[in-house]
A protein has these predicted regions:
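Generic beta-sheet signal
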Residues: 91, 120, 161-164, 188-189, ...
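A short, aliphatic-rich alpha-helical micro-motif
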Residues: 122-126, 179, 317-318, 343
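Short, conserved active-site loop motifs that form the nucleotide-linked donor/cofactor pocket
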Residues: 115-116, 183, 207, 298
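Small-residue (G/A/S/T)-rich helix-start motifs and N-terminal tracts that mark the onset
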Residues: 4, 8-89, 100, 195-354
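Internal gly/pro-rich beta-alpha loop/helix module
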Residues: 125-127, 132-222
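Nucleotide and nucleotide-moiety/phosphate-recognizing core
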Residues: 51-132, 140-162
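Short, hinge-like loop/turn segments at secondary-structure boundaries
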Residues: 106-109, 176-180, 203-204, 296-301
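Short gly/ser/thr-rich secondary-structure transition/capping motifs
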Residues: 112-118, 142, 166-170, 232-237, ...
C-alpha cells in the first residue's frame, strides 16, 4: 500500500499520522530498499504541487527555496511552472555548496531551462510557493530565514506551502520562532502530526495529501498516532427502530467525590457519545443535584461516604456490562472499599483510572 494509508483498528479505519522521524524512515526505505530514486520522488512531489495549482489565477509566481530537499522540491516546481508558460522566479539566499545533492541537481536543471533564480525580491508582486524549510526543522527559525518568513506573511499574496509551512514543527505543530501562514499546504504520502495539531493546523490552511509513491515500509505494526477518517462513520451501526436504550449496553460510572462532580459528568458524557444506551452513575450523595442537572438522562445512585450500602452497589455491578471506576474519586477509605468491592464482584470489563 502506498501514499495515504489507513489501518484496521478493532474493526475501524484509522488514518496514520507521522512525525518527522517516521516520515524520513519511509523516505529512506522507499529509496534504499525499494529502489525508487530520490530524484523521481522529488519530481513526483513537484508534479503534485503543480497539479494542485491548476485552475488558479497565479499571475507571477515566486518559489521560495531553502537548501534542503524541500527546497529541491521548490526548484522542480519552479521549472515545471516555467515550462507551462507561467512567469516564475525562484528566491534562493543560500550557498549552493551547502545544498543536498538532490537540490544541487534541481538547481542545475532549473538554470538549464532558463528559470530566474534571484537572491532578493519584492514579495508583494507574487503568488508564493513556500519551499524554504521542511519537516526536519527542530529548532527556532532565526536570521535571514526568519526575515523571509516575516516578509511572506506581510503580503496579501496567495501562499501554498510545500509539505509543511516553514517554521512549523512536524512533530507537534508548534511554531518554532516564526512560521509561514499558508492558505493551502500540499503534504506528501501521509499527514504529519504537526499539520493536525494546533497551531500548526491553523498555519497550514487547507490540507491536501498527495500520493507520490512513498511506501509505508518501516512503520510499526501498531500505529503510534492516528486519526479517524470519514469512512469510520460508516461503520457505526444504525439503531433498530424496535430497540430500546438497554439494547446498546449498560455502563456503570463510579466516579467523583465531594466537590469533584466534573469527573463523573465527563465520564458519563463520554460513554453516551460512544453510543452507550444506558449509563449508571455511582457517586457521593453530595453530587446528586449538579449531576442530575447536567446529565439528567443518566441513572444516578448516591452513596453515603461514612455508611456505604454494599448491597446497592453490588446490584449496580451485576447489571452493568462495562464498569468505569476512579475518575475524581480521591483516596478516601470509601474509595478503597468501593474499589475492593468492584474487583471482587465484577465479571465484566473494567476501566480503572489511577
Amino acid at each position: 500500500m502506498q501514499g495515504k494509508m489507513s489501518f484496521i483498528i478493532r474493526g475501524g479505519l484509522m488514518e496514520y499520522l507521522v512525525n518527522s522521524r517516521e516520515m524520513k524512515l519511509c523516505d529512506f526505505n522507499t529509496i534504499n530498499k525499494l529502489g525508487m530514486p530520490s530524484m523521481v520522488l522529488m519530481e513526483r512531489a513537484a508534479l503534485a504541487v503543480v497539479e494542485e495549482l491548476e485552475g488558479l489565477d497565479l499571475g507571477k509566481v515566486l518559489v521560495v527555496c531553502g537548501k534542503g530537499n524541500n527546497g529541491g522540491d521548490g526548484f522542480a516546481i519552479g521549472r515545471l511552472l516555467h515550462l507551462k508558460g507561467i512567469q516564475v522566479e525562484i528566491l534562493f539566499i543560500d550557498e549552493e555548496e551547502g545544498c543536498s545533492q538532490e537540490t544541487k541537481e534541481q538547481i542545475k536543471i532549473a538554470r538549464n531551462y532558463g528559470v530566474k533564480i534571484l537572491d532578493q525580491v519584492e514579495f508583494n508582486k507574487y503568488t508564493i510557493i513556500d519551499a524554504l524549510l521542511g519537516i526536519g526543522l527542530s529548532r527556532k527559525v532565526r536570521g535571514k530565514y526568519a526575515e523571509i518568513i516575516d516578509e511572506i506573511n506581510k503580503t496579501s499574496a496567495y501562499i501554498l506551502a510545500v509539505d509543511i509551512p516553514s517554521g512549523i514543527s512536524a512533530d507537534d505543530g508548534k511554531v518554532l520562532g516564526t512560521a509561514v501562514r499558508a492558505h493551502k499546504t500540499v503534504t506528501f504520502a501521509f499527514k504529519k502530526i504537526g499539520l493536525v495539531l494546533y497551531p500548526g493546523a491553523e498555519y497550514a490552511g487547507e490540507l491536501v495529501v498527495k500520493d507520490i509513491g512513498i511506501n509505508h515500509l518501516g512503520f510499526e505494526k501498531s500505529p503510534k498516532t492516528y486519526s479517524h477518517t470519514p469512512e469510520d462513520l460508516k461503520l457505526v451501526p444504525k439503531r433498530r427502530p424496535y430497540s430500546n436504550k438497554g439494547s446498546y449496553g449498560k455502563v456503570l460510572v463510579i466516579a467523583g467525590s465531594l466537590d469533584m462532580a466534573g469527573a463523573a459528568y465527563l465520564s458519563a458524557k463520554a460513554s453516551y457519545r460512544m453510543g452507550v444506551g444506558l449509563v449508571y452513575i455511582y457517586t457521593v450523595e453530595e453530587n446528586r443535584e449538579i449531576l442530575q442537572t447536567l446529565i439528567p438522562e443518566a441513572v444516578l445512585t448516591g452513596y453515603n461516604r461514612v455508611d456505604l450500602d454494599e448491597g446497592t452497589l453490588i446490584g449496580r455491578i451485576k447489571d452493568a456490562r462495562v464498569i468505569v471506576i476512579g475518575p475524581g474519586m480521591g483516596i478516601s477509605k470509601a474509595t478503597r472499599k468501593i474499589l475492593e468491592l468492584v474487583l471482587r464482584e465484577a465479571d465484566v470489563p473494567l476501566i480503572i483510572d489511577a
